[in-house]
């Protein structure tokens, strides 16, 4: 049986205007729900053609949908069908659209391809579209597959990694019985049609390996009764949460360094609650690090203490 390709191979084909197959494996968990091994045909929206849309509709058995970042859809004033509207496993669904200058009703492969390209065109404005139409947009969660491991987020992530607009087109692949195709079928399907195939799991690993996922917001010395620490304030680009690194002494020597991962506890750390020992643990860590001469405390906020 043919195997999976690398994310790098998939990116190269996407940049050359080809379709790829994107698979979430059976053990993938999305929004707390068990995945079913679903596979999707995917390509960059800006390179979509009538032939590619026709292929998706004939071979995937499903009408193609457009996936895009939240910011991109908001700029085009494309909103949810109803506030909070969600499709299967949490996919966020928008109101269907047609490009205003489609030749016919918008249902043909040519018209759908035009609408999809318009949705990815940086020059497009809300006035370029009419609603309802025949192309349904799906809104990706900020943070992509590192926030939600779905096809919507994966396709937008791949588009961005491919240096394209954050807009893609996907279509779920069905087998001959009309059911969602399983992984062996998807591997054979990709091999038969010469498509690269990769998993969302591998995309998650690729992003974690190649991207810097935190940003330094501020740095400041902080005198304490245990000595002077340097405080580094970071913000996660995935969940937008703040993280604090309290550094004491020189930790760049390559020698083993004391490190504490501390779950932030307002009541224990700052208010002196006797219902937990969080504050005591933090002070003890600062004291031990000062005695050792160097070390780091990573302070993770929004992890409230046990006892309140």
Segments (PLM) and residue ranges:
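Catalytic domains of riboflavin
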Residues: 1-308
